[in-house]
């Protein structure tokens, strides 16, 4: 076999370490230095399995079993399992509690992974309404309407799914209202917390949710791929059913999920998560400051206002205007930010972009604001 492996010898991430990364999908997954030191010992394949006696969630060394119990407390749920991401968590719920052909009633801002999960589980869906431009908020009452409509036409509803914070606008949905509707109608309720758990405080019990899908690499300062599924005890038997052949192994987990660095990194970052969610108000202050400072430049923030989450989506007609006359065309903004050590804004975009300053220091936030101001004021 003639395979040239030279190209794998110097794989680098091609990202200057000092760069300030504004990509919302990446800000919540940055590991604190302490976690980086801990995972150094765990880079071998099945590194957490040295003392396994049959199942990942029961491993005592390293203390995965205790970590999962503590994580349940952190999320206000009863039982937690590691997964490879929020999408795998959603799929595990759908595949276990719904029957083929059932309907999932989900919000109009649901992520594509909710759709691929339900398609893979051979389910149908009904999408609820959202507000129009520019807020695009989920309308909780629409859940009741869609449920009534499906019931009237004798369709079987298997699950109610809500995206806690959507990735397009960063709107925080009214979970309590949707939870009340799901409960009063008697349907199980799954909350997709990919963009919330680990960034902001979550209490599943208070929110009336039956399942939480969380994402380690997106919002829990963990190496990807990694996630969590937290469930209400009531659903333990269905969701965590074990194999008839190997009675210890859970079917939806295909026996065991995260078997190395990802789960270990999540454990190593747990203390950091506990501390950082306490500072959510400060994150919102920084986010709102960015919006207030940048809108006068000719940006328009889309989604609910003021911001209740760190994702910021701006419409940017001013960048479009500059791109018309700049010889770098649409790439000027990316290039100018890069010169200033700022990355994470998509290359070539001028009509709108998304950003987040989650976890940056106040000095870094001011630097980002001033950099954008100076780019636009110099080139307009
Ligand atoms: C709202 C939302 N849910 C789920 C996901 C997927 O998360 P994961 O990669 O953990 O499956 C994303 C990723 O962008 C997301 O924005």
UniProtKB/Swiss-Prot annotation:
Gene3D superfamilies xrefs: Aspartate Aminotransferase, domain 1 (3.90.1150.10), Type I PLP-dependent aspartate aminotransferase-like (Major domain) (3.40.640.10)
Coiled-coil region list: none
EC numbers on record: 2.5.1.73
InterPro entries in alphabetical order: PyrdxlP-dep_Trfase, PyrdxlP-dep_Trfase_major, PyrdxlP-dep_Trfase_small, Sep_Cys-tRNA_synth_arc, SepSecS/SepCysS
SUPFAM superfamilies according to UniProt: PLP-dependent transferases
Enzyme class: transferase
Claim: Thylakoid is one of the keywords in the record: no
Gene Ontology annotations of biological process type: translation
Assigned keywords, A-Z: Protein biosynthesis, Pyridoxal phosphate, Transferase
Reaction it catalyzes: O-phospho-L-seryl-tRNA(Cys) + hydrogen sulfide + H(+) = L-cysteinyl-tRNA(Cys) + phosphate
Residues recorded with modification N6-(pyridoxal phosphate)lysine: 218
Positions annotated to bind pyridoxal 5'-phosphate: 86-87, 192, 215-217
UniProt-recorded Gene Ontology molecular function terms: Sep-tRNA:Cys-tRNA synthase activity
Necessary cofactors: pyridoxal 5'-phosphate
Subunit record text: Homodimer. Interacts with SepRS.
HAMAP family: Sep_Cys_tRNA_synth
Chain's role: Converts O-phospho-L-seryl-tRNA(Cys) (Sep-tRNA(Cys)) to L-cysteinyl-tRNA(Cys) (Cys-tRNA(Cys)).
Family from the record: Belongs to the SepCysS family.
Protein known as: O-phospho-L-seryl-tRNA:Cys-tRNA synthase
Source organism (scientific name): Methanococcus maripaludis (strain DSM 14266 / JCM 13030 / NBRC 101832 / S2 / LL)
């Amino acid at each position: 076999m003639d395979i040239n492996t030279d190209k794998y010898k110097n794989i680098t991430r091609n990202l200057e370490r000092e760069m300030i990364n504004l990509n919302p999908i990446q800000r919540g997954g940055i590991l604190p230095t302490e976690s980086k030191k801990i995972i150094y010992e765990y880079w071998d394949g099945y590194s957490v399995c040295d003392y396994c006696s049959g199942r990942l969630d029961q491993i005592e060394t390293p203390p995965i079993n205790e970590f999962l119990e503590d994580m349940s407390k952190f999320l206000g749920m009863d039982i937690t399992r590691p997964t490879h991401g929020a999408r795998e968590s959603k799929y595990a719920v759908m595949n276990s509690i719904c029957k083929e052909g059932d309907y999932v009633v989900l919000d109009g801002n649901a992520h594509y992974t909710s759709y691929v999960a339900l398609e893979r589980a051979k389910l149908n869906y009904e999408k609820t309404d959202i507000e129009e431009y520019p807020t695009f908020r989920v309308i909780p009452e629409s859940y009741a309407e869609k449920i009534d409509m499906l019931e009237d036409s004798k369709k079987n509803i298997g699950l109610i799914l809500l995206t806690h914070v959507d990735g397009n606008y960063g709107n925080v949905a009214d979970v309590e209202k949707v939870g009340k509707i799901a409960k009063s109608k008697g349907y199980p309720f799954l909350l997709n917390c990919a963009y919330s758990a680990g960034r902001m405080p979550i209490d599943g019990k208070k929110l009336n949710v039956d399942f939480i899908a969380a994402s380690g690499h997106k919002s829990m300062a963990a190496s990807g791929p990694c996630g969590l599924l937290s469930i209400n005890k009531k659903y333990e038997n269905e969701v965590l059913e074990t194999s008839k052949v190997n009675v210890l192994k859970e079917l939806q987990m295909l026996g065991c999920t995260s078997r190395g660095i990802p789960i270990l990194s999540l454990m190593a970052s747990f203390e950091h998560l506990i501390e950082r969610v306490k500072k959510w108000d400060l994150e919102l202050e920084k986010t709102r400051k960015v919006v207030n400072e940048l809108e006068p430049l000719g940006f328009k923030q889309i989604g609910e206002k003021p911001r209740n989450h760190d994702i910021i989506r701006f419409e940017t007609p001013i960048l479009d205007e500059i791109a018309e006359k700049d010889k770098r065309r649409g790439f000027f903004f990316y290039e100018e930010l890069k010169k200033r050590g700022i990355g994470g804004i998509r290359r070539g975009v001028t009509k709108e972009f998304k950003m987040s300053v989650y976890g940056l220091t106040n000095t870094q936030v001011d630097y980002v604001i001033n950099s954008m101001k100076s780019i636009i004021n110099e080139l307009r």
